Amino acid sequence: MSASTSRTLPPEIAESESVMALIERGKADGQIAGDDVRRAFEADQIPPTQWKNVLRSLNQILEEEGVTLMVSAAESPKRARKSVAAKSPVKRTATKTVAAKTTVTRTVAATAAPAVESADAADDAVAAAPAKKTAAKKATAKKAAAKKTTAKKTAAKKSGKQDDEILDGDEAAEEVKAGKGEEEEGEGENKGFVLSDDDEDDAPAQQVAVAGATADPVKDYLKQIGKVPLLNAEQEVELAKRIEAGLFAEDKLANADKLAPKLKRELEIIAEDGRRAKNHLLEANLRLVVSLAKRYTGRGMLFLDLIQEGNLGLIRAVEKFDYTKGYKFSTYATWWIRQAITRAMADQARTIRIPVHMVEVINKLARVQRQMLQDLGREPTPEELAKELDMTPEKVIEVQKYGREPISLHTPLGEDGDSEFGDLIEDSEAVVPADAVSFTLLQEQLHSVLDTLSEREAGVVSMRFGLTDGQPKTLDEIGKVYGVTRERIRQIESKTMSKLRHPSRSQVLRDYLD
C-alpha cells in the first residue's frame, strides 16, 4: 500500500498502517479531519514524543497530494485536556499566549465557513465547514505575539468559545488562530495545527520569575512605596476615624470581662479594620519620610537608616493624630518625623556619643555661627558668640570642642592616597635622637667620675640612687649587702657626696643639668 509512487515515503509514515490508510482515504475525499490523524497515531501506538515529526512528514505528503487537513471546531477544551493527560507523560499547559513562545511556527490552516454568531451555535460546537487550504508559512515569535491581541478580540465575539486550551508540548497542538488585519472580522477565524521548534526539547520549559530587584536598595524602596497613591484631606479624616474606632474596639476587648459573642465579633471586625486603616495611612505617607530624610544626609548616617528612623516617627504620628483639629496629616507628621531623625542622629551618628541636650546646644551654636558669618563677613569671635547665645566665652569654647568630629588616623592624604593622616602626627613616646645621645654621654661621664672613688663608695652611691638598675635602695638594704649598719652606710654616703661636689669631679657633670 503506497500513497505515492513518485517519491519514497519516510519510514515513520511507511511503517504506520493506519496513517497510510488515512492518506489513501484523504486522496479519495480530498480532505482529512484532525481527529482522524490523532486516532491513527493512537491506533499505531506512535509515542507522543514522535507525533510532531510524524505530523510534519504527513503534512508534506498531504501538500504534494493536494489533500486538505481540517481541524474540527467541535473539540471542547475539557476533552482535549483529558486526551492529552492520558497519552502524554510530560504535560504542558498552553493558553492563547503560547504563540508568543514559538520561535518558528508552521500553520496548516483552513478557513471556516461563515456561521451565525450565537451562544447556542457555539455551545453545540458545530464543526466548521471545509475550505481551501492555505499555503504553509513560517512566523517568528514576535509575529505570533502581535497576533495575540487580535485573536483575543475575535474570540470574544464568539459567545461560549473558551480561550484556554490544554495543549501537549510533545504533540502537534490544536490552536485557534486569527487571520491577519481586517480579514479576521470579515471572514472569521482560522484554525490549524501549530508546529513549534520549541517542541524539539521534551523537557518542560523552565519558568524564571523576575522580581525586578536592582543593585540599588534605595531605588527599589522608592519604587515600592511609589505604588501607593497619595491621600487627600477627606481620605485622611476617614482613615483617622477608622483608626480611632479600632483603638476603641481594642480597648473594649482588652478591658471587658464578658462580652456577648455577637458584640465581640463586631468589635474584632472594627479593630481589624482600624489596623488596616493605620497601615494604609502609613504606606501612603512613606514618601513624606523620604523627602524629610534627604535633608539630613551626609551627617554620619546612611540614607536608608535615616528613612527607617523617620518611619518610626511616622508611626508615632499616626497613633497621635487628631483629625478634629482640622490640619492635614502631613503637617502634623512632619514634626514627629524630624524629631525621630534628629534624635537618632544624636544617638548613633557620632563615634563618641554626646548627650542629646548637648547636641541641641551644639546645633544652636552652629546655626548662630553661620548666621553671624554671613552678617559680619568673617568668623565671629567666642566673645561675640557668647553675647549672642547668652553664655560665657569659656562655655562657647567648650561647646565648640564638643562639636568637633573625630577623624581617622588612616584617612588617606594627597591625590594618590599613598600616605595617611597618622603619618603626620608626632609620636610623643618616641625618643628624640639628640636626647638619646646626650643621655649616653651623661652615663659615660658619670661612670668616669665614679671610677675616681673607691669600690665601696661607688657601690653605695650607685645602689642608693639606682644608677645600675633604676631602683633606689634604702640604707638598710645597702647595709645588708655590705654587712654593716645603716648608720655606717649613711656616713659613707655623706662622705662620698662631699667628694663628688668637688669642682674637679662635678664640673664635667654640670653641663648636663640644663
Swiss-Prot record:
**Positions of the region Sigma-70 factor domain-4?**
449-502
Map out region (Disordered) in residue numbers.
Answer: 135-205
Fetch the Pfam families from UniProt: Sigma70_r1_2, Sigma70_r2, Sigma70_r3, Sigma70_r4
Give the residue ranges of motif Interaction with polymerase core subunit RpoC. 305-308
Region entry Sigma-70 factor domain-2, spans: 281-351
Coarsely, its chief localization is: cytoplasm
Where, subcellularly, is it found?
A: Cytoplasm
InterPro entries the record matches: RNA_pol_sigma-70_dom, RNA_pol_sigma70, RNA_pol_sigma70_r1_2, RNA_pol_sigma70_r2, RNA_pol_sigma70_r3, RNA_pol_sigma70_r4, RNA_pol_sigma_r2, RNA_pol_sigma_r3/r4-like
Biased-composition ranges, Basic residues, are: 135-159
The protein's UniProt keywords, in alphabetical order, are:
Cytoplasm, DNA-binding, Sigma factor, Transcription, Transcription regulation
Q: Which GO terms describe its molecular function?
A: DNA binding; sigma factor activity
Annotated DNA-binding ranges come to 475-494
Highest taxon of the lineage:
Bacteria
Q: List the induction conditions.
A: Transcription is regulated by the alternative sigma factor ShbA.
**Where is the segment annotated Sigma-70 factor domain-3?**
360-436
Record-level GO BP terms: DNA-templated transcription initiation
Record-level GO cellular component terms:
cytoplasm
Q: How does it assemble?
A: Interacts transiently with the RNA polymerase catalytic core.
Role description:
Sigma factors are initiation factors that promote the attachment of RNA polymerase to specific initiation sites and are then released. This sigma factor is the primary sigma factor during exponential growth.
Regarding protein family, the annotation reads: Belongs to the sigma-70 factor family. RpoD/SigA subfamily.
Spell out the protein name for this chain.
RNA polymerase principal sigma factor HrdB
Species name for this entry? Streptomyces griseus subsp. griseus (strain JCM 4626 / CBS 651.72 / NBRC 13350 / KCC S-0626 / ISP 5235)
Q: Which gene encodes it?
A: hrdB
